Curated annotation (Swiss-Prot):
Its cofactor is Mg(2+). The record marks 79 as: Interaction with target DNA. This is Endonuclease V. GO terms for molecular function: deoxyribonuclease V activity; magnesium ion binding; RNA endonuclease activity, producing 5'-phosphomonoesters; single-stranded RNA binding. InterPro entries: Endonuclease-V (IPR007581). It comes from the Bacteria. DNA repair enzyme involved in the repair of deaminated bases. Selectively cleaves double-stranded DNA at the second phosphodiester bond 3' to a deoxyinosine leaving behind the intact lesion on the nicked DNA. It catalyses: Endonucleolytic cleavage at apurinic or apyrimidinic sites to products with a 5'-phosphate. It comes from Roseiflexus castenholzii (strain DSM 13941 / HLO8). Its EC number is 3.1.21.7. Belongs to the endonuclease V family.
């Protein structure tokens, strides 16, 4: 696949905010996709002054690894909470462009609508690629939620400024929840179902585990 940004890299903070507002206006929050046969885990981290992105494509629902790519790109945007897409997305887009298989769904290690301006990396990547996308984060960026039952699959809305922006989801009993939010072309309820379908015996979905292992260890867990 050959995704590309509809805006230049880099941008300054003022431009970044305008871009986020424009992307947010394009986010589709209902189910708008065909059959999902492949799902890609997306993760990005930092090495010195570079962003390192890893993407692993898994068959769905078997979760067998089919394709992967890594990309490194010089960081040109400052570290500002709420604007990390502008540091990470260029490298992720490079990795996506290197794939042999175009995934049917992106599952990002980060947020979608659960973001101060409702435009986390899952929204950014979903709109730029026009692929259905989900944010599945390890911690809260914005919002709060009610206590969550200690039962696999239990979830409760994540609310911010009187708006439901995502969900706290218990993937396993006895572990901290993950935080699921809409990225693009997927409803929140469906996003939760996809995350649970990608969870095996660990807290995190296999998409996240595979991309994180590829980025940090250079291998995909079996």
């Amino acid at each position: 696949m050959k995704p590309s940004a509809d805006h230049p890299w880099p941008v300054d903070l003022g431009e970044a905010r305008v871009i986020q507002e424009r992307i947010r206006a394009q986010v589709i929050t209902c189910d708008a996709f065909g059959p999902i046969r492949t799902v890609a885990g997306v993760d990005a981290g930092y090495s010195g002054d570079s962003a390192l992105a890893a993407v692993v494509v898994l068959a769905f629902p078997s979760l067998q690894a089919l394709d992967y790519a890594v990309a490194r790109r010089q960081i040109s945007f400052p570290y500002v909470p709420g604007y990390l897409s502008f540091r990470e997305a260029p490298a992720v887009l490079d990795a996506l462009a290197s794939l042999r298989i175009t995934p049917d769904l992106l599952m990002c290690d980060g947020h979608g609508l659960a973001h101060p301006r409702r435009c986390g990396i899952a929204c950014h990547l979903g709109v730029l690629t026009d692929l259905p996308s989900i944010g599945c984060a390890k911690s809260v960026l914005v919002g709060a939620h009610d206590p969550l039952p200690d039962v696999r699959g239990a979830w409760t809305p994540l609310r911010h400024d009187d708006e439901i922006v995502g969900a706290a989801l218990r993937t396993r009993p006895g572990v901290r929840p993950v935080y699921v939010s809409v990225g693009h072309r997927v409803s929140l309820e469906t996003a939760i179902q996809f995350v649970m379908a990608c969870v095996t015996r660990y807290r995190l979905p296999e998409t996240t585990r595979a991309a994180d292992a590829l980025a940090s260890q250079g291998r995909i867990p079996r």
